[in-house]
Amino acid sequence: MAVKSLSNSILTPLQKKNRKQIQVWLYSILLLCLAIVLVGGATRLTGSGLSITEWKPIHGVIPPIGVEQWQEEFLKYQQIAQYKMLNRDMTLSAFKVIFWWEWAHRVLGRLVGLVALLGLIWFWAIKHIEKNVLLQLIIVPILIAFQGVVGWWMVASGIGQSNLTSVSQYRLAFHLITACFVIIFVTYLSQGLAEYSEKPASHRVQYFAGWLVVLILIEVYFGALVAGLHAGKVYNTWPLMDGQFIPDGLLQHDPIWLNLFENPLTVQFVHRFFAYILFFVAIIHAFYVQKNIPHSIHARRAFFICVMIAVQALLGIITLLQEVPISLGLIHQSVALAILCFSVAHWRATKGAYRAIE
């Protein structure tokens, strides 16, 4: 029998109630994901990411207890290149500080996975999930589990026999981008269950809003490469780099494409100038939406995205000039996540809510 679709405007009171409950659950997942990324940023900025050298998905929740267990954990850390090359004078007390950052990051990851899985089981059991969103909701805990595997794959690049004193910038960037995919997916899904007073925008506006999200994600990716290469610690001037608008040495690696991933100068250059491009595209998008849907909520959201990107650019400049202190680095990352979430919400709003299934 064919499934009949109903518009969002004629949702039954029960459907509205069920959707709001699922939204609350998805928002809790989203907040936990944002917290994980921010704690992960602090873990990276404090050099704590390699402090736990084993992956124990179940038993890893329990931290060391007593001096003997702490000494054992510290001894494991002393076997990796980061300790041998950078931290030979580290004390047990100092080790505990970096350990707790990484431990908190991992425990939050387990918590969000648990919230996603148990919530899915609960809402499915009480039949609150509409057929047209069931598959998307099943994907949420799968994406989170995959992200956990990627996290360990990233950490593995800096332990064992590795000569790296930090994780691979490639794996770090991939880890952040997969986290962003989870955030995008959960935001998009939750906003698809929202109620909207305005009508969906034209398909062209929808496509433009979607591509803006893609550009923001690309900028986040290059920001992750900047972090992985510690590229924010060099060329701490603006608007020029080393006294030049286009500095020498952008293409010093062979093959040329390698500069986009392993040359700190090139990576910072691309991150800077892609931000200018992103801001320009966001302005065009805002005026395009205003032209097509004058004085609409869609248009106001589009202009607010421009404001957020401008604020983020200013924060980026200040963070660079200050040589990336931990506080500014985390604020810069937080605003990036806020822009990503808001742009996804804007994109979903241009499409309207999911139609209900009768």
UniProtKB/Swiss-Prot annotation:
Pathway field: Porphyrin-containing compound metabolism; heme A biosynthesis; heme A from heme O: step 1/1
EC number: 1.17.99.9
Disulfide-bond pairs as recorded: none
Bilayer topology annotation: Multi-pass membrane protein
Assigned keywords, A-Z: Cell membrane, Heme biosynthesis, Iron, Membrane, Metal-binding, Oxidoreductase, Transmembrane, Transmembrane helix
Record carries keyword Metal-binding: yes
EC class: oxidoreductase
Main location: membrane
HAMAP family reported in the protein's UniProt record: HemeA_synth_type2 (MF_01665)
Protein name: Heme A synthase
Record gene name: ctaA
